């Protein structure tokens, strides 16, 4: 399937970005940690590397080095998407996606989820965003996704054989990386075909707890 957007070009948009996979992961992590762990945000370089390499709530799982993350942070800073915050003990990094891409908070959260976990259904996005933004229902999620699509920052992926729902994916990455990610997700069985929404939510909550434990353990190593 060819990944295209029917949006009228605006500035800034996905065509002007085409971030690499490391940059995509960094922005997704900064958005996530700002929403879920505000007490430790902005993040130090070490904390950001740990977040990037989490084994849960990430698709794909990555193994980035401090050098790779640091280089990508500087590249993102040059595009106005991250900012270095100087500190007395350690320097920290924050994202500027809201200003850099002119997004409202709900759109920032959805973009972060799409950056971290690839193509997802509306139901998945609604469940996974519950700790980060208060969407009243799936219609609110769809409304914000449609605004991202209109900006050329996301696209609708029609359901494939064996799938019950359409999916949405971001268009901020390199086109070849996006094609590979989409192909992998289309070949994988749909998660939760026989699971209830409550069961899916419990699984996502468990993943969040595991991710928090992984982060604590990594800091002790």
UniProtKB/Swiss-Prot annotation:
Family affiliation: Belongs to the UPF0502 family.
Output this protein's name: UPF0502 protein PSPTO_2686
> Which domain of life, per UniProt?
Bacteria
HAMAP family per UniProt:
UPF0502
